[in-house]
Structures are given as C-alpha cells and as structure tokens.
Amino acid sequence: MKQKHYATRLAEVCSHLNAEHARYVLVGAAALQLWGTTRATRDVDILIDPTVPNAKRVLRALARLGMGFAKELAPDDVVRRPVTIIGDIANVDIFTRAWNLRYAEAGPAATLFEVEGVKIPTASIEHLIESKRTGRLQDAADIEVLEEIRRLRG
C-alpha cells in the first residue's frame, strides 16, 4: 500500500472528525507544523472534549477511515484514559489531556488552519507551549521554537 502524503492524511482524518461534529483540537508535532515548525511526525495527535458522546463521534470518524480498532473501543474507556492510540505505523493519538492542558481551555481558543480544503482546529501557540511542559528534551526544544514563532508574530 502506498504511503499517503502527511498533509493528505491529516486532512482526511480531520475531515472525518469534522463530518461527525467531533469536538477536538490538533496538538503535538502536527500542530507545530501548522504553526510553522519543521518537526517531523507520522502521528495525528488530537485533544478531545472528554465526554462519552464526543468520544463516540471520534471513534465513529476513525472507524469510517478504516481504523478497525476504533470500532472495538468503548467510548467510556477512551474518556477515562489520558491517551488512546489507534493505528500502527501512522497513529491517531486521542488525548483527554495533553500534559496539563484540557479541551475546555484549548477548544475555545483554537486557531483554524486549512489543509487541503479542510478546516482544522489547532491548539494556540500558548496552549501548545503549556502542553509541552513535560520535562522531555524534545518538548523543551519545541517550546523554544514555539516561543520564537510567538515572538516573530508579535
């Protein structure tokens, strides 16, 4: 099977989430890319509103993408876990919290980016910085880059 271009895959995942009216924001390396970094990733990390009805919408969207494992998960299990990983080589990681960041904070402040005609709610620079305060070296490097982007944007 031919590997899809990452932007196409990201747009496809988010298109399905949008069609199901899932409440989510893009976080992680994919969000950093949309803000202008060159961080490589194959994963799509989403921070969701951790309610059972919303988890159902998210799982339904991923199942429609052919991610069969999404059909086997119970929405209440997803809501109880901090992260659920769906996929193998290129995962969709469903977060109910990204370090100490919650959807209740990040959702209303999300910035919409458009990728291949799909609107993608993306965590703000401030919220991405907050989500990266983990103590990991890669996250510390990401914070430096995000702070520089914030400085350049004024």
Q: What is each stretch, according to the model?
A:
Residues M1-G154:
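Compositionally biased terminal segments of proteins
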